[in-house]
Swiss-Prot record:
Interacts in vitro with QS. Residues 22-32 have a biased composition (Low complexity). The keyword Nucleotide-binding does not apply. Its main location: plastid. Keywords: Chloroplast, Lyase, Plastid, Pyridoxal phosphate, Transit peptide. Its EC number is 4.4.1.-. This is Probable L-cysteine desulfhydrase, chloroplastic. It is found in: Plastid, Chloroplast. GO terms for molecular function: lyase activity.
């Protein structure tokens, strides 16, 4: 599909977004010859590798050549991506286990997982290695924290009716976990209603203060605040540092930050954020194979971390959460073992992971503004409140009027136009006239190109010209 940029603009765009690290003998695909023997200190002590050049655009294409070339894949936020070189190293780890499982289990698994934890600890600026546990995903991490909350209610450490405060836009599975662990144990749940579209961070801060006051009503004590770092749908970067400070001033016992879209997408610094618990997937924006995440548990948290346990109980029960999480029975641990190699992969890009975040943010804003201009709509939040994802309003004339409509439209775009894109339904407010009720969430990752977004632009414009309505789509 022809680009809407002029040749000089196109050349400038690709120059800005493909300045990366070289593929030299130390690239991830050749590192360690499949044995992954380098010590963790080799990676964490050298945040930047001193190569004269950066990975080229053709090398990036090769790393992601397993992606279906017929699709505009602009939904990295849902499932992430993993480069071919890391997938090859993952396969090496899988074969090492299958080749001699006894030696792998007794001699290699725990120290290599410990290496991965050390990499994560330094990336997130945690104080101690044992504050970091590696788990399957952010959903598992939420279950660990909420399980502790449930036990506190059941054992009488929390009074029945004490509150857990969470954002209305919390991820669906986390809401279900709150229902399963907190509500069933006698806790009171307060949801903070957030606006969308969002005009400023102050709106969110003000609404959060109101939500906390509601949680504390009738003499209740707020035992846990559950705050997203980047909400999923709609996607907005939450001012978590400010919200954590408010929680401290208001006497909230513990703060848990759900950052499924954290590492590789936004700045993640445990000492600056100051939360008791923080979780982030590594397979969404840090190029890990699915699935792997970390759970940070601050040692000085109220109630300590000794009563945090993995929900899958193994013979490691009672040895600390980090050790419990390192063995939950026979399974494939390879996604956890390639973390040091992923750090080396991202350091092939100019600026490492920070450079990737910056370029992804700039690119997704640029593409979002291009779509807004073409469709005559608006962004869902100011550019500074998005990371590597941004919400873009769809033309009102498409007639998006329900959750069913957005699901059908998403399927239609995938099957007819080969575009992978999530869509959000925003119910109209009272008195609104012709509001935008449908928003697409576009992501930008290193493998994306402007033509991916041009395909979406042109598909929607074509539907508008044809008088398309969501009501025309069958179930």
């Amino acid at each position: 599909m022809a680009s809407s940029l002029s040749p000089p603009e196109e050349a400038s765009y690709h120059h800005r977004h493909t300045k990366r690290y070289t593929s030299s003998a130390s690239s991830a695909s050749s590192t360690t010859n499949g044995t992954v023997e380098s010590s963790v200190s080799d990676f964490v002590k050298r945040p930047k590798i001193s190569h004269p050049n950066y990975i080229s655009s053709s090398e990036i294409e090769s790393e992601f050549s397993h992606h279906d070339p017929d699709f505009a894949r602009i939904n990295n936020g849902s499932f992430g991506c993993c480069p071919s070189s890391i997938l090859a190293l993952q396969r090496d780890w899988q074969l090492r286990f299958l080749r001699q499982p006894d030696r792998f289990y007794f001699d290699e698994l725990k120290p290599k997982i410990s290496d991965s934890r050390s990499v994560i600890k330094r990336l997130i600026n945690a104080e101690h290695d044992d504050e970091v546990s590696i788990v399957d995903n952010a959903t598992t991490a939420a279950a660990i924290v909420l399980q502790q909350t449930a036990w506190a209610f059941r054992e009488g450490r929390f009074d029945k009716g004490d509150a857990v405060v969470m954002l209305h836009y919390a991820y669906g599975s986390v809401k279900k976990s709150v229902e399963a662990y907190v509500t069933r144990s006698g806790g009171h749940v307060t949801e903070v209603q957030l606006p969308f579209p969002v005009i400023s961070a102050d709106e969110i801060i003000d609404r959060f203060r109101i939500g906390l006051e509601s949680g504390k009503a009738n003499g209740r004590r707020v035992r846990l605040a559950l705050i997203d770092h980047v909400t999923s749908m709609p996607s907005v970067v939450i001012p978590i540092k400010e919200l954590v400070k408010i929680c401290r001033r208001e006497g909230v016992d513990q703060v848990f930050v759900d950052a499924a879209h954290g590492i590789g997408c936004v700045d993640v610094d445990m000492k600056e954020i100051g939360a008791d618990f923080y979780t982030s997937n590594l397979h969404k924006w840090f190029f890990a194979p699915p699935s792997v995440a970390f759970l940070y548990c601050r040692k000085s948290s109220n109630g300590g971390v000794a009563d945090l346990h993995h929900p899958v109980v193994s013979n490691e029960y009672g040895n600390g959460l980090a050790v419990e999480s390192s063995w939950v029975g026979t399974r494939d641990y390879s996604a956890q073992l390639v973390v040091p190699s992923i750090l080396e992969f991202v350091n092939r890009f100019e600026g490492g992971i920070d450079g990737i975040k910056k370029r992804n943010h700039e690119s997704v804003v640029e593409m979002g503004q291009m779509l807004v201009k073409s469709w005559g709509t608006q962004l869902g939040c100011p550019p500074e409140m998005c990371a590597s994802m941004i919400m873009v309003g769809l033309p009102v004339c498409l007639g998006v009027s329900s959750e069913s409509d957005v699901l059908k439209l998403r399927t239609f775009l995938r099957e007819k136009f080969r575009i992978e894109i999530p869509i959000y339904f925003r119910p109209p407010g009272d008195g609104e006239i012709d509001p935008i009720t449908g928003y697409v969430r576009i992501s930008f990752q290193v493998y994306n190109k402007p033509e991916d977004y041009h395909r979406l632009r042109d598909a929607i414009n074509g539907l508008v010209r044809d008088g398309f309505k969501c009501t025309s789509l069958s179930c």
